[in-house]
Curated annotation (Swiss-Prot):
Residues carrying sugar: N219, N271, N285, N322, N372, N394, N400, N407, N414, N478, N735
One record GO biological process: regulation of synaptic vesicle fusion to presynaptic active zone membrane
Transmembrane feature ranges: 545-565, 623-643, 804-824
Protein name per Swiss-Prot or TrEMBL: Glutamate receptor ionotropic, kainate 5
Compositionally biased intervals (Pro residues): 912-923
InterPro entries tied to this protein: ANF_lig-bd_rcpt (IPR001828), Glu/Gly-bd (IPR019594), Iono_Glu_rcpt_met (IPR001508), Ionotropic_Glu_rcpt (IPR015683), Iontro_rcpt_C (IPR001320), Peripla_BP_I (IPR028082)
């Protein structure tokens, strides 16, 4: 208890001039100059009565609000009013609501006296910062309003806009909006109202500039004036969109101004779900009727609701402050330097207030600005207004998709639209009998069918007509546009349905729907088909040089194999190692013929009966087999492509190749999107291509796709066009092909005038057609009727005789050669047989032929020669006996027994000649027979005992018997002395 008493004494002596708070007094400055009033006075009374009837803050203190009228926005008058307020000992000052300059003066004086100031109107621009004190504002900050307008523009995809300002400070007030346009490099034109306040000249300028989005930064009365003048100029149609920054948008009287399709947007802060809102509106309505019986009540003004919330905010802060300390009021004067000691504490509690009022959630940040609130976005109509979205103070926007814009079926139902188009296969074409038809029936194509689907879906009618100048649309130096774009800008058409490319430059002046087809720029060129596969096309996988080197490799391998086999001792072998009576005679299987045949068998992957024995010959065989493996695999891999693909001869393969040469001309459609793409491109290759196309004479630009196709087929010309058209014309003409890939990615859309009310309806309908697969069905209908198949749809086909007929020719030639050789061998053999048998050649040939054509006989007996001379075996044996050994080889001796007398080694004798006749010359040595060391010893013994018969000859009968044929393909057929 002593402590509490001491505290009260300290407070009493510390504030001797403060009076104990018996009533909570506030001062409200009203600047309402309207006839019927905005209801601010009534709102203050309602707030006072509601608070006094529910709570007492502080204990036994009632709320009192002193009202002061401000006749005009004057600094002197405002200062005089404040000098009247200060001696009354108020805890807060409210208002004014519509005089920013006066509100700034009030804030300055309250800051000097440390009395909280509650603002209920727009901020002054620029916003003054006070070092000692600050006020709090229930009105949205300029930054929030600017951000809300900017987000709405982005939500509706408005590329350009015009700003009408009532005061010069609007650029500072809407600083965030202006900064957004500067960053996006979009167009924002600013127009200032003059002192006459007549917006007609400004509206005419906006109409001439083809700007459809208009932002009005003014109070409610001036905004109403601008809209009324706009209605007189016919600028309130569906083409124009208005955004008002005033927060009194709900009370604007727009009867007779807005149309059914008008788009006028504004903001509202009212919390219609507040429990006291119906009573508040009813009370204001009754007051309005008492003061203004002749006019209709428009609704509650925002300033009245802000005054109501301001009283509650101050009471809430005082109640919280009173819990920690007792509050006392102090009369002040303008001429003194005294301050209210509790003002700073109350200001701190004001910043901490959290209250749900008629204007929504009330909270403040450290700067005293309102935060954590919402702005309802309303759209005006004849029936009133409807909410289409909400903007939150955390800089987010939520649009209501169900109420955004007008219902589709109600917008286009039973309306007739003028549709401009351009002839372009297969999008829009004339029917073959179009002269006998009229209206829309004259045309057909993909776009015509799509337009018919849209009309059935949205229930509208249309009238097709061709664009007057036959162009898609490009900007002129004077700023105007040609083609379909120009007709949309000048309102000559409602829609443009064709192969209409969506570009950023066109989007600035017209609107587009969502793309109904995605594509890119491609290169179309005429190709010369390569020669068709001939009878000898199986030789195409390898060049002639490769075939020549393969032949040389074959000959080289054969020679190396022959030499290696002759030099290596491991290739000489005994053909009969198991017969002990046989002599040690070594044979070599690699004769010259076998050496040539062995690589052929390996190359043909068939092998042969000849197997290498020595390491050297195996090495040669291995590398040859590896060589043939790679060659055959490569040949097989390339053969199918060379026999099935008819190669095309294309001199360039990409846009870079096209830009690097000058032999082939290239160009685009004049005044089309492709031309604009190259004109605006910053890529070096495309810039070079544009410089070439622009400077080339005669011009490389064409007026239509058909002209470009004809130029491609008749000259060295590459046509740059959209990939979908490229695909269509390649299906019609097989001599056309696409070079490289796509140069960009874009889409075709339906064009509309800027701000057209049909944009969203048509976009949604296109999306619905895509989801139902109707657009894909239409594309297949008009693209799959060509004579040439799609390149990616090639399938394997059976090879004809024109592909592989040459191998049959080779086979037939080989068979003919084989038969010819067989006939020659047959003739040669029968001729020799006839001489040995001493019969006529014809008789011998007839007998051999009879045996050869006998299908059942597979063997025959060898005929013996007639008697009368020594047998061939005896002659051979005699020749062997007369052979001598020289350098490890067997040679036949000469007449005098000297081998050297006959000019060196000769071959073995085949026939000793007639009986009693002279001996023939000594033959050359048998190069494939080698005599071992044992034979050398026998030869020496035979030379020492010349008269003794050699061991192993047997009886004379055996000596005279015909020799046995030796097995083996290369073994010698002659008998040696051992046999």
């Amino acid at each position: 208890m002593p402590a509490e008493l001491l505290l009260l004494l300290i407070v009493a002596f510390a504030n001797p001039s403060c009076q104990v708070l018996s009533s909570l007094r506030m001062a409200a400055i009203l600047d309402d100059q309207t006839v019927c009033g905005r209801g601010e006075r009534l709102a203050l009374a309602l707030a006072r009565e509601q608070i006094n009837g529910i709570i007492e803050v502080p204990a036994k203190a009632r709320v009192e609000v002193d009202i002061f009228e401000l006749q005009r926005d004057s600094q002197y008058e405002t200062t005089d009013t404040m000098c009247q307020i200060l001696p009354k000992g108020v805890v807060s000052v409210l208002g004014p609501s519509s005089s920013p300059a006066s509100a700034s003066t009030v804030s300055h004086i309250c800051g000097e006296k440390e009395i909280p100031h509650i603002k209920v109107g727009p901020e002054e621009t620029p916003r003054l910062q006070y070092l000692r004190f600050a006020s709090v504002s229930l009105y949205p900050s300029n930054e929030d309003v600017s951000l809300a307008v900017s987000r709405i523009l982005k939500s509706f995809n408005y590329p350009s806009a015009s700003l009408i300002c009532a005061k010069a400070e609007c650029l500072l007030r809407l600083e965030e909006l202006v900064r957004g346009f500067l960053i996006s490099k979009e167009t924002l034109s600013v127009r200032m109202l003059d002192d006459s306040r007549d917006p007609t000249p400004l509206l005419k300028e906006i109409r001439d500039d083809k700007v459809s989005t208009i932002i009005i930064d003014a109070n409610a009365s001036i905004s109403h004036l601008v809209l009324r003048k706009a209605s007189e100029l016919g600028m309130t149609s569906a083409f124009y969109k208005y955004i008002l920054t005033t927060m009194d948008f709900p009370i604007l009287h727009l009867d007779g101004i807005v149309e059914d399709s008008s788009n006028i947007l504004g903001f509202s802060m009212f919390n219609t779900s507040h429990p006291f809102y119906p009573e508040f509106v009813r009370s204001l309505n009754m007051s309005w009727r008492e003061n203004c019986e002749a006019s209709t009540y428009p609704g509650p003004a925002l300033s009245a609701a802000l005054m109501f919330d301001a009283v509650h905010v101050v009471v809430s802060a005082v109640r919280e402050l009173n819990r920690s300390q007792e509050i006392g009021v102090k009369p002040l004067a303008c001429t003194s330097a005294n301050i209210w000691p509790h003002g700073t504490s109350l200001m701190n509690y004001l910043r901490m207030v959290e209250y749900d009022g008629l204007t929504g959630r009330v909270e403040f940040n450290s700067k005293g600005q309102r935060t954590n609130y919402t702005l309802r976005i309303l759209e005006k109509s004849r029936q009133g207004h409807r909410e289409i979205g909400v903007w939150y103070s955390n800089r987010t926007l939520a649009m209501n998709a169900t109420t955004l814009d007008i219902n589709l079926s109600q917008t286009l139902a039973n309306k007739t639209l003028v549709v401009t188009t351009i002839l372009e296969n297969p999008y829009v074409m004339r029917r073959p009998n179009f002269q006998a038809l009229s209206g829309n029936e004259r045309f057909e194509g993909f776009c015509v069918d799509m337009l018919r689907e849209l009309a059935e879906l949205l229930r509208f009618r249309y009238r097709l007509r061709l664009v007057e100048d036959g162009l898609y649309g490009a900007p002129e130096p004077n700023g105007s546009w040609t083609g379909m774009v120009g007709e949309l800008i000048n309102r000559k058409a409602d829609l443009a349905v064709a192969a209409f490319t969506i570009t950023a430059e066109r989007e600035k002046v017209i609107d587009f729907s969502k793309p109904f087809m995605t594509l890119g720029i491609s290169i179309l060129y005429r190709v010369h088909m390569g020669r068709k596969p001939g009878y000898f096309s199986f030789l195409d996988p390898f060049s002639p040089a490769v075939w020549l080197f393969m032949l040389l490799a074959y000959l080289a391998v054969s020679c190396v194999l022959f030499l290696a086999a002759r030099l290596s001792p491991y290739e000489w072998y005994n053909p009969h190692p198991c017969l002990r009576a046989r002599p040690h005679i070594l044979e070599n299987q690699y004769t010259l013929g076998n050496s040539l045949w062995f690589p052929v068998g390996g190359f043909m992957q068939q092998g042969s009966e000849i197997m290498p024995r020595a390491l050297s010959t195996r090495c040669v065989s291995g590398v040859w087999w590896a060589f043939t493996l790679i060659i055959i695999s490569s040949y097989t891999a390339n053969l199918a492509a060379f026999l099935t693909v008819q190669r095309m001869e294309v001199p360039v393969e990409s846009a870079d190749d096209l830009a690097d040469q000058t032999n082939i001309e290239y160009g685009t459609i004049h005044a089309g999107s492709t031309m604009t793409f190259f004109q605006n491109s910053r890529y070096q290759t495309y810039q070079r291509m544009w410089n070439y196309m622009q400077s080339k004479q005669p011009s490389v630009f064409v007026k239509s796709t058909e002209e470009g196709i004809a130029r491609v087929l008749n000259s060295r010309y590459a046509f740059l066009l959209e990939s979908t058209m490229n695909e269509y014309h390649r299906r019609l003409n097989c001599n056309l092909t696409q070079i490289g890939g796509l140069l960009d990615t874009k889409g075709y859309g339906i064009g509309m005038p800027l701000g057209s009310p049909f944009r969203d309806e048509i976009t949604l309908a296109i999306l619905q057609l895509q989801e139902n697969n109707r657009l894909e069905i239409l594309k297949r209908k008009w693209w799959e009727g060509g004579r040439c198949p799609k390149e990616e749809d090639h399938r394997a086909k059976g090879l004809g005789m024109e592909n592989i007929g040459g191998i049959f020719v080779v086979l037939i030639c080989g068979l003919i050669i084989a038969v010819f050789v067989a006939v020659m061998e047959f003739i040669w053999s029968t001729r020799r047989s006839a001489e040995s048998e001493e019969v006529s050649v014809c008789q011998e040939m007839l007998q051999e032929l009879r045996h050869a054509v006998s299908c059942r006989k597979t063997s025959r007996s060898r005929r013996r020669r007639r008697p009368g001379g020594p047998s061939r075996a005896l002659l051979s044996l005699r020749a062997v006996r007369e052979m001598r050994l020289s350098n490890g080889k067997l040679y036949s001796a000469g007449a005098g027994g000297d081998a050297g007398a006959h000019g060196g080694p000769q071959r073995l004798l085949d026939d000793p000649g007639p009986p009693g006749g002279p001996r023939p010359q000594a033959p050359t040595p048998c190069t494939h027979v080698r005599v071992c060391q044992e034979c050398r010893r026998i030869q020496a013994l035979r030379a020492s005992g010349a008269g003794a018969p050699p061991r192993g000859l047997g009886t004379p009968a055996e000596a005279t018997s015909p020799p046995r044929p030796r097995p083996g393909p290369t073994g010698p057929r002659e008998l040696t002395e051992h046999e």
